[in-house]
Amino acid sequence: MKDKSIKVLEFNKIQEILKNYTCTKAAKDIIEDLKPYDSVYEVREHLEEAKEAFKLLITKGAPPFEGVYDIRNGIYLAEKGSALLPGQLLKIAAVLRCARRFKEYINHKEEEESYRVLENICEGIFSLPKIEEEIFNAIEGEDEIADRASSTLYNIRRSLKEKNYSVRDKINSLVRSYSSYLQENIYTVRGDRYVLPVKAEHKGAVPGLVHDQSSTGATLFIEPMSLVNLNNEIKELMLKEKAEIERILTVLSAKINANITGVKTDANIVWELDFIFAKAKFASEYNCTCPTINNEGIVDIIEGRHPLIDRREVVPISVKLGEEFTSLMITGPNTGGKTVTLKTVGLIHLMAMSGLMIPARENSVISYFNNVFADIGDEQSIEQSLSTFSSHMKNIVEIMDKADENSLVLFDELGAGTDPTEGAALAISILENLRKRGTKIIATTHYSELKAYALRKEGVENASVEFDVETLRPTYRLLIGIPGKSNAFEISKRLGLPDYIIDFARENISNENIRFEELIENLQEKSIKAQEDARLAENLKLERDKEKKKYEEKLEGLQKVRDNALIDARREAKNIIKEAKEEADKILKDIRQLERMGYSSDARRKLEEERKKLKDKLDSIEEKEIKTVHKGEALKNVKEGDEVLLASINQKVIVLSKPDNKGDVLVQAGIMKITANIKDLRAAKGSNFNSSSSKIKKSKKLNLNLRRVESSVDLRGMDAEEAIYTVDKYLDEAYLGGLGEVTIVHGKGTGVLRKTIMDMLKGHSHVKRHRLGEYGEGGTGVTVVELK
């Protein structure tokens, strides 16, 4: 890729913007070296990593880059075997922590979306939590080692603290004793030793060692002899503390050295991730998308925006190239946006090929080119000097030497700077030669000859930048398929040039040129009208989709209401059954108590009375439930305009169509139109219909088994097989009948039948627990079973 083209297209400015989103100098250095990759595969992988990082920013928020540093110098020193400073060790630990946390950050549950490229990068992370923990435990700040760094350091500092307390007590006592000889009644420290500020004239009154004097010489700082030993002990402890700190730093540095490969790898991955997430943050800020990449020369940029132009002012452009045509000629007025179009296309390609998402709409297509050549400068006129023409021609010569079918060439005002006739002929020759090579070309021009060349040559297409003659301002919109019209006469007239001069100028133009310009004007008007119609259609489609989504959400809400109603109904029915079973169980327990007391006949009569009450109660609830759910009469036919009840959602609706052969009708519920079957329609209250029946049909019934089930079963006289069958059938009936506890009579005998029944009950689905009968219940001759 040509460095000159990269510079002309201002890719370096994108790099500078990108650097603002990084956390480390190392990531900035990666961006500094960023350029288009060498293959389509690399481009796709680096775009995918940016896309994945973009998704992670949205779904999981900012990545764990807190406290990430550039630790290259620390790694270098550790690798050489040097002892690192506390701050250097802390920064290395912070990077190791970031690498470990990032592995956790990117982790996802099985059902969540995976991040293939980023996960592959993170696979290389060593994770060194032990070293990380040791450093953070030992070092508290840039120049502060924690007491817990070692037991030796802890003991030294404790002794040092005690000695300092002792010497302060001693020197405070001396301050009071020598107060008349001191400049101030305080003590101070000189060279890590406690001293007194003694007046120079009284130096003999305070025996000791002179360590310093004031700038005026009026004060001597004397260490009293009684403190010398204590100060010596403090000094020794301080030296021991320093030696222990150096030992701790050496040990920690050695551990970094021993794991230098893991540390370097983790650091490099963190810096790479810093760079990748800078790309994602840039994409988020500039509303970028991930394009589709091909190597077939096909370009389809949808509403691309130049990222260096103010986002409030930039006008999106859409450019196609490579399928229907391989060369695009852009014509139009000066300052109309032709050069910006070239730069936008070129810069977007450089960004995509460097793994950056692009400022364009979704589904944009970018081709991978081996080279992007750009001959772009200030817009030129025919009065340009030979030197300027020569400068352009020098670039063109180089392009002609290297461009091939895998190249994109951008020409700004091709052929300008010389005689128009010669310039146009030269431009056509250059374009035709490159076209035959298969080179993809976008060129801007003023020459009518190039418009005509594009009209007649297959594979070459005209385009123009739109100009508003009313306001005398360009709109910067690109119109593909329409050559640019010269607006010199219209602009001159609006600026006040007399009509007779303009008319005379028109007379000097051939009829053929006039007709050509009129044709272009007509095409432009039709194209603009077509684009306006397309935009209107797109807006209508968006509004329709929005309304559709709103109705679908309302329908979903209604369905949820219906589902919740059904759930509530089922829950209520379940509660009714539960209450019924609890009431029946209570009655049975009371009856069993009565039976044990010898009141069997009365108990049975009471049981039947209670069961009848319970059945009547449930029938009443069931009838009430049925009447509540489906009001209205069943319908056989409906007509347009009828108001009916849609039973499934229990809501009144208006019939909009007659039933089809399947019985489906279109109805309106509020603002929604729904297709329903006539079987789901009922006569709404207050509506007159001829129905087949005026009776309320029960569509839902509480299916409770209220037939009488005995509270015990007698197995005496049966063999094992018959007994098992009888008990199984009986337990089903008892369970459906809502009994909570039953008795199985098997007799005492040899105990074989009892054992058979006990074994069967252990795995039975209806049995909660079972036991042998107690005294008064039949003893070991019966088994009492509690049902679920």
From Swiss-Prot:
CDD domains: ABC_MutS2 (cd03280)
Nucleotide-binding keyword on record: yes
Binding site for ATP: G332, P333, N334, T335, G336, G337, K338, T339
Keyword annotations of the record: ATP-binding, DNA-binding, Endonuclease, Hydrolase, Nuclease, Nucleotide-binding, RNA-binding, rRNA-binding
Highest taxon, organism lineage: Bacteria
Molecular function terms, GO-annotated: ATP binding; ATP hydrolysis activity; ATP-dependent DNA damage sensor activity; endonuclease activity; mismatched DNA binding; ribosomal large subunit binding; rRNA binding
This enzyme's EC code(s): 3.1.-.-, 3.6.4.-
Enzyme class: hydrolase
Nucleotide-binding listed as a keyword: yes
Pfam families (alphabetical): MSSS (PF20297), MutS_V (PF00488), Smr (PF01713)
NCBIfam families for the chain: mutS2
Subunit text: Homodimer. Binds to stalled ribosomes, contacting rRNA.
Family in the record: Belongs to the DNA mismatch repair MutS family. MutS2 subfamily.
Function: Endonuclease that is involved in the suppression of homologous recombination and thus may have a key role in the control of bacterial genetic diversity. Acts as a ribosome collision sensor, splitting the ribosome into its 2 subunits. Detects stalled/collided 70S ribosomes which it binds and splits by an ATP-hydrolysis driven conformational change. Acts upstream of the ribosome quality control system (RQC), a ribosome-associated complex that mediates the extraction of incompletely synthesized nascent chains from stalled ribosomes and their subsequent degradation. Probably generates substrates for RQC.
Name used for this protein in its record: Endonuclease MutS2
The encoding gene: mutS2
